[in-house]
Amino acid sequence: MAQEVLTDLNKVRNIGIMAHIDAGKTTTTERILFYTGVNYKIGETHDGASTTDWMEQEKERGITITSAAVTCFWNNNQINIIDTPGHVDFTVEVERSLRVLDGAVAVFDGKEGVEPQSEQVWRQAAKYDVPRICFVNKMDKMGADFYFTVQTIIDRLGAKPLVLQLPIGAEDDFDGVVDLVEMRAITWRGVVPTGALPTIEEIPADLVEKAAEYREKLLETVAESDEALMEKYFGGEELTVEEIKGAIRKMTVASELYPVICGSAFKNKGVQPMLDAVIDYLPNPLDIGEVVGHKLGDEEVEITRKPSKEEPFSALAFKIAAHPFFGKLTFVRVYSGRIDPGAQVLNATKGKKERIGKLFQMHANKENPVDEAVAGHIYAMIGLKDTTTGDTLCDQASPIVLESMSFPAPVIQVSIEPKTKSDQEKLGVAIQKLAEEDPTFSVELDEETGQTVIGGMGELHLDILVDRMRREFKVEANVGKPQVAYRETITKKVEKHDYTHKKQTGGSGQFAKVIIALEPFVGEDGATYEFENKVSGGRIPREYIPSVDAGAQDAMQYGVLAGYPLVNLKLSLLDGAYHDVDSSEMAFKVAGSQALKEAARKAGPVILEPLMAVEVTTPEEYMGDVIGDLNSRRGQIQAMEERSGARVVKALVPLSEMFGYIGDLRSKTQGRANFSMVFDSYAEVPANVSKEIIAKATGE
């Protein structure tokens, strides 16, 4: 077995590597695994494999982490790396990982600086208050500019960077960094083989002045963070390395500033100091402190759990993945307590008991079975049947529900039609597996056509899902054109609407009367529906109230204009009547359903469409064409700015107008422009577009 899980949580870091798709995230992660792999490989003589053998084998396999979380060791510290994807269609994956990590390394391209995807991931990290250090990568690249990149962190992210290193040389001559904390040069001169140790040198003469200037800025920032340090510094005393690092750590953990270091992962330069910075400045589970949840069945009652083995067990499932040998792996972050393989736990989210089969921590090149799961760590569990992303697992005797993750509804759909009966069966298996892994993947059956309709967060997302069905599950199917996931809502309040459901067909009949109010509504947590019972005096027996709610929710699946789901409404049940013999749960369910449909027709129903936040980067000479094209797609231009010598146009554009955009953009700009697109919000469609949508849906 590899190195044991560290139980001293001061020596544990749960981190993510965040980056734009091309900033070098995979290479950076590979290098971290290699350098830390060397560290723990040395202690493993029993398998006779040398480090170089392992590296060759990894080269063949290409360590692009397929695991959701990888454990490695550095200088007697344990680092659990949670993988975060770099593409915009997978922002949910990013949110999912940010929810369970304690700190992150934001990787930037030293030439491009902060790019659109970096901005988005940075904002998501801010939402979960994740402390970050910044690694300016690709310093060996033509046109790389460390100081420009630091400025873009200020200008584009509105963040406060704290420079801890300066680059020595640039582009092909990038040889190392000046360490401003210890005032020394760390160099990797010439072509550096992977795994080579750096040389510690004097600061080069041409950088002494600049290093002194940045060192002074660093010391002033450190001194201002603590009264005792301020007195010492301004009293002319030297601050020790420990004092400087301690102050930087405190400010980083509080997200007051973001330490900036640099290197070239590809050229093996700057990786070891980056790992040192992860240990020195990013928080451990004890820094993060207790996790807050609520009582099972009562969201008003808050419960906390400390990151300690002595507390009752609690964990959050953050990713489901398929494994070729073990089947379904459930990745969890354990927040408190401990648990053994074979133990039974409560899935508090679903109210079901689950038995844990085996427990693993994933290493770069193998699964490492462990004897227990303890607070502060990330594990893969085997054997959980009903647990999905966002579920809480806990001690049955001390239940807690941790804050779950909210996922956006899919904005784009395609129909999928299996070619043969055997494909139909395989499709069923594929859909079940993919839905377990990805909470933004939706499936429904079109009752009219009998086709299966799948939904996702963008064209690329759906392309990848369909491709996985073909490759992994061998499903041959015809895939339809992408369709927009429209919604319907109401714009006016209906103060009072009554509906009586009455049926008499010999014997006992059916009777239920409801009086409801309907109004537009959006919940604070993004909820799109609320039911309030205002019935008093037993006019409707208590046991029938949930049936009215259930009937209304059923009716919301198919709107009143074009059959799209109804969202953003509140239904208040005001009054009603019942019959001792003829009333039933079914009768009140029908009444609730019909009352909602009729009231919605009177409440100014409209169709909503998904708007995408589109960002186009283009050479200046094509700016006019790009803006004209976006306007013709019903786009609203939000902002224009200059970035790295190019122009950037930000706009909100309906998704329905963005199909095939990449081809049009390339032809208009001779392939020199690119764009990114992410879901922003739903908005009401104009009347003329609404008419077309309704006509298409109703066939009129």
From Swiss-Prot:
Gene3D superfamilies: 3.30.230.10, 3.30.70.240, Elongation Factor G (Translational Gtpase), domain 3 (3.30.70.870), P-loop containing nucleotide triphosphate hydrolases (3.40.50.300), Translation factors (2.40.30.10). Pfam families: EFG_C (PF00679), EFG_III (PF14492), EFG_IV (PF03764), GTP_EFTU (PF00009), GTP_EFTU_D2 (PF03144). Residues 10-286 form the tr-type G domain. GTP binds at residues 19-26, 83-87, 137-140. One of its GO terms (cellular component) is cytoplasm. One of its GO terms (molecular function) is GTP binding. GO terms for biological process: ribosome disassembly. PANTHER family: RIBOSOME-RELEASING FACTOR 2, MITOCHONDRIAL, TRANSLATION ELONGATION FACTOR G-RELATED. Belongs to the TRAFAC class translation factor GTPase superfamily. Classic translation factor GTPase family. EF-G/EF-2 subfamily. This is Elongation factor G. It comes from Rhodococcus erythropolis (strain PR4 / NBRC 100887). The gene is fusA.
